[in-house]
A protein has these predicted regions:
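Anionic group-transfer/hydrolysis microenvironments
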Residues: 111, 150-151, 159, 218-220, ...
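Short acidic-hydrophobic, aromatic-tinged amphipathic segments that line or gate anion-handling sites
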Residues: 100-101, 122-126
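A short glycine-rich, hydrophobically flanked beta-strand micro-motif that places a catalytic Asp/Glu
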Residues: 38-39, 145, 156, 212-224
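A short linear hydrophobic-aromatic micro-motif
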Residues: 97, 106-107, 143-147, 214-217
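A short beta-strand motif that forms the metal-chelation/ATP-contact edge
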Residues: 48-52, 109, 158-160, 225-238
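C-terminal active-site "lid" helix and adjoining low-complexity regulatory extension at the edge
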Residues: 208-212, 221-257
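Phosphate-binding site of ATP-dependent enzymes
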Residues: 124-210
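Conserved N-proximal alpha/beta basic substrate-recognition cap immediately N-terminal to
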Residues: 3-99, 114
Length: 257
C-alpha cells in the first residue's frame, strides 16, 4: 500500500493515512500480507500481487505504470484527475459541468495537478480579479489552469468506490469539516431535493472514463434539483464515512483479480 506524499495531502495528511490504514486492517483480517510504504520510497525487491495506491507524484505514477499487477487506483487514471485533463474528459462524455461565464464570480484552479496549497484554487469576484489571479498562477510557473463560473446552490460532497455499490453524499457546511474554507462560499445548505441515484450514475460514469475506482468529488445542487460536478478526485480521505468506505475498498481485491 502506497501512502500519499504530504505535498499532495494539504491539511489532510492524517485523514489520508487513516483510510489507507483502515483498508490495510481489513485486508490483514482476510489473511493478506500487507506492507505500507511512503510514496517517496517505492519499495525495491519482490513485486506484490496487488497494490492499493494513493500516490500522486508524477515520477511515482510513471514507475507504477510498468507494474504488471492490479493497482487501485491505476496510475493512468490518477494522472487523468489533473484538472485540465479531467475537464476534457468531462466535456467529452457530457458530465454536467458549471458554465464558463456567469454573474456571481469565477473559480480558477490549477490544471496540471491536484491542489497542493490554498493558492491552487482561487475565487475571483469579477473578471478583473480573475485576470489578476491567472497572472498570479503564471508567476508561480503554473501555465495550465481551468476557469468556471461560480454556481449558486447547495455544495454536496460525494464519495464512491466504483462497482461496489458504495456511494455516500454529505453537506460540508452541516459538519464544518473543511480543507481550505472554500466550502463556505455557497453558504449554509438549503438541502434542496435532488436525485442521488442520478448523481451516482454520473459519478460512476466519470470514474470509468477517467480510469479510477476509488473516488470523491463535489457538486452543486441548484434550487430546482439540477446539479453540476465542480470537482472530482482520486482516492479522497473518506473522513465522513471511513469505516464503510474501507470495507468497500478492501473488497476490490476480489473484484479486480
Amino acid at each position: 500500500m502506497i501512502q500519499r506524499a504530504e505535498q499532495f495531502s494539504p491539511n489532510s495528511v492524517e485523514k489520508d493515512l487513516a483510510i489507507l490504514e483502515a483498508v490495510a486492517q481489513r485486508l490483514r483480517l482476510q489473511g493478506h500480507e500487507v506492507t505500507m510504504q511512503s510514496e517517496a520510497a517505492l519499495a525495491q525487491g519482490r513485486q506484490p500481487d496487488f497494490i492499493f495506491s494513493m500516490a500522486r507524484h508524477p515520477e511515482i505514477l510513471a514507475i507504477l505504470k510498468f507494474f504488471s499487477i492490479p493497482i487501485v487506483n491505476a496510475p493512468a487514471g490518477t494522472q487523468n484527475c489533473a484538472r485540465s485533463t479531467l475537464e476534457t474528459i468531462m466535456t467529452r462524455i457530457g458530465t454536467p459541468m458549471p458554465p464558463r461565464e456567469g454573474n456571481d464570480g469565477y473559480w480558477l484552479k490549477r490544471g496540471d495537478a491536484a491542489a497542493q496549497e490554498r493558492g491552487d484554487v482561487v475565487f475571483a469576484a469579477d473578471r478583473a480579479a480573475l485576470d489578476a489571479a491567472i497572472e498570479g498562477m503564471r508567476r508561480r510557473g503554473i501555465e495550465k489552469y481551468v476557469v468556471s463560473a461560480h454556481v449558486k446552490g447547495d455544495l454536496v460532497k460525494f464519495y464512491g468506490v466504483a462497482g461496489t455499490g458504495f456511494f455516500r453524499c454529505f453537506y460540508p457546511t452541516d459538519d464544518g469539516q473543511t480543507k481550505f474554507g472554500d466550502e463556505q462560499r455557497n453558504g449554509a445548505a438549503h438541502h434542496y431535493a435532488y436525485d442521488v441515484a442520478s448523481l451516482q450514475q454520473e459519478a460512476e460514469r466519470l470514474a470509468a472514463a477517467v480510469g479510477i475506482a476509488v473516488y470523491g468529488g463535489d457538486c452543486i445542487v441548484r434550487a430546482d434539483g439540477s446539479f453540476c460536478l465542480i470537482d472530482f478526485n482520486d482516492w479522497p480521505s473518506f473522513s465522513r464515512c471511513r469505516e464503510e468506505a474501507a470495507d468497500a475498498i478492501a473488497s476490490l481485491v476480489k473484484v479486480r483479480r
